[in-house]
């Protein structure tokens, strides 16, 4: 199993599937289509049925039941795309067997070093096989680790028919990283009673609370004139952007928050005197606090418009997803079974809120309750990203055990 995980994962991460916030196609990038087509063929090779990829790039497949019991249909999902925060082109995965727990020089030329000082969890992986980047790209374990684990788990179940299970549905979705994953997901066609996303982080992660999330695009319009004669004429759009940011609470940013604390996060800022554009994300677990944060953004914009003119600041703000807890609580048994599955495998469940979102955040509100399970990855979205193959193997075991327990309890 370990070799299959390594082979699939290292092959998958070399395919550039970064999504693109600026694109209006579905999926937003051709790499996701290319990857989806490959997975369709490999799902067929494994032996799954009803394998298809629709016009929007969603891949679905079925592992038929091998029991006569009336078992609810369960689903397992992962996403095709990788994050846009750092380049995902020309990924060169590096395999470190029997890791010694010490610092790893990812790239000597660029002096990129993965150190225990910066990443204190690193020594806990001593003895594991870990896969890192070469220091020039992200790895793409988010979510190609989860995707690989689903593929390997389905292969394992097919080759071990003594493990009884009900009908299992598999889906791989595009554009999760930009919040569009479930936008065209056909819940009815998927046909599962509930599902699990394999899109978590370190060993034991079991998550069914997510942020409420919104994205805010701000355009600041200035007036450019020669600086020598600019008095009472120039309006500097870049300074307007700085002023807006200055009205947000400094301590309510990602770098100062944890646990259940929400934040405002400036993702990008670019422009000049004439025009500047900023993109923020707004996050909070509590719905009332979430609405208050959005209203704060609107009020800052309104005050700046009154001060500089209505055209000085233009705001586009949209909700992206909501806290899935509200939809998971009525079917809490799906969390309990995942919890029990982990315990039976000597994995200590780590239940905590997702300081982010998964496809499950939206799918839960579309009628498909979907908690999230660990994949074994660390430090997502950057050059220090890595994954433990040992913990990927444990994630596969959790998938198999969840399927087995649902059949056993039917």
Swiss-Prot record:
Extract one GO BP annotation from the record: peptide catabolic process
Query: Which positions are annotated as binding Zn(2+) 1?
Result: 79, 142, 199
Q: Which domain of life is it from?
A: Bacteria
InterPro entries reported for this sequence: ArgE/DapE_CS, Bact_exopeptidase_dim_dom, Peptidase_M20, Peptidase_M20_dimer, Peptidase_M20B
* Cofactor: how bound: Binds 2 Zn(2+) ions per subunit.
Q: Where is the active site?
A: 81, 176 (proton acceptor)
In short, the EC number is 3.4.11.4
Q: Which UniProt keywords apply?
A: Aminopeptidase, Cytoplasm, Hydrolase, Metal-binding, Metalloprotease, Protease, Zinc
Q: Where does Zn(2+) 2 bind?
A: 142, 177, 381
The cofactors named for this UniProt entry are:
Zn(2+)
Q: Does the keyword Hydrolase apply?
A: yes
Q: Name one GO molecular function term.
A: metallopeptidase activity
| Cell compartments where the protein resides | Cytoplasm
Predominant location of this chain?
cytoplasm
Q: Provide the catalytic activity annotation.
A: Release of the N-terminal residue from a tripeptide
> PROSITE patterns of this UniProt entry?
ARGE_DAPE_CPG2_1 (PS00758), ARGE_DAPE_CPG2_2 (PS00759)
Q: Which family does it belong to?
A: Belongs to the peptidase M20B family.
List the protein's name.
Peptidase T
Q: Which organism is it from?
A: Bacillus cereus (strain G9842)
Query: Could you read off the lineage of the organism from its UniProt record?
Result: Bacteria, Bacillati, Bacillota, Bacilli, Bacillales
């Amino acid at each position: 199993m370990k070799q299959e995980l390594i082979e699939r994962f290292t092959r998958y991460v070399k395919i550039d599937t970064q999504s693109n916030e600026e694109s209006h196609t579905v999926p937003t990038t051709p790499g996701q289509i290319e990857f989806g087509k490959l997975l369709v063929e490999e799902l067929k090779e494994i032996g799954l049925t009803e394998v298809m990829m629709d016009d929007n790039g969603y891949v679905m497949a079925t592992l038929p039941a091998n029991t006569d019991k009336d078992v609810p249909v369960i689903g397992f999902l992962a996403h095709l795309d990788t994050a846009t925060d750092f380049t995902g082109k020309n990924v060169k995965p590096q395999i470190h067997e029997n890791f010694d727990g010490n610092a790893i020089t990812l790239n000597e030329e660029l002096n990129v070093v993965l150190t225990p000082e910066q990443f204190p969890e690193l020594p806990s992986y001593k003895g594991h096989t870990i896969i890192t980047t070469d220091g020039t790209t992200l790895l793409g374990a988010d979510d190609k680790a989860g995707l690989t684990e689903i593929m390997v788990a389905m292969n394992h179940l097919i080759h071990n028919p003594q493990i009884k299970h009900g009908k299992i549905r598999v889906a791989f979705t595009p554009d999760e990283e930009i919040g569009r994953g479930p936008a065209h997901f056909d819940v009815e066609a998927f046909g599962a009673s509930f599902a699990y996303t394999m899109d978590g982080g370190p060993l034991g992660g079991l998550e069914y609370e997510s942020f409420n999330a919104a994205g805010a695009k701000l355009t600041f319009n200035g007036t450019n004139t020669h600086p020598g004669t600019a008095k009472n004429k120039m309006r500097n759009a870049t300074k307007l952007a700085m002023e807006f940011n200055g009205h947000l609470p400094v301590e309510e940013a990602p770098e100062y928050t944890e646990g259940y604390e929400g934040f405002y996060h400036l993702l990008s800022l670019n422009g000049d005197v004439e025009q500047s554009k900023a993109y923020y994300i707004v996050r909070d677990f509590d719905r009332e606090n979430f609405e208050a944060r959005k209203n704060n953004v609107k009020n800052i914009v309104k005050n700046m418009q009154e001060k500089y003119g209505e055209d000085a600041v233009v705001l586009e703000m949209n909700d992206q997803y909501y806290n899935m807890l509200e939809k998971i609580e009525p079917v809490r048994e799906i969390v309990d079974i995942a919890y029990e599955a982990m315990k039976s495998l000597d994995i200590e469940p780590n239940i905590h809120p997702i300081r982010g979102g998964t496809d499950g955040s939206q799918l839960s509100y579309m009628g498909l309750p979907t908690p999230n399970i660990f994949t074994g990855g660390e430090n997502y979205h950057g050059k220090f990203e890595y994954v433990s193959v040992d913990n990927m193997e444990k994630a596969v075991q959790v998938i198999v055990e969840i399927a087995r327990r649902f059949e056993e309890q039917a």
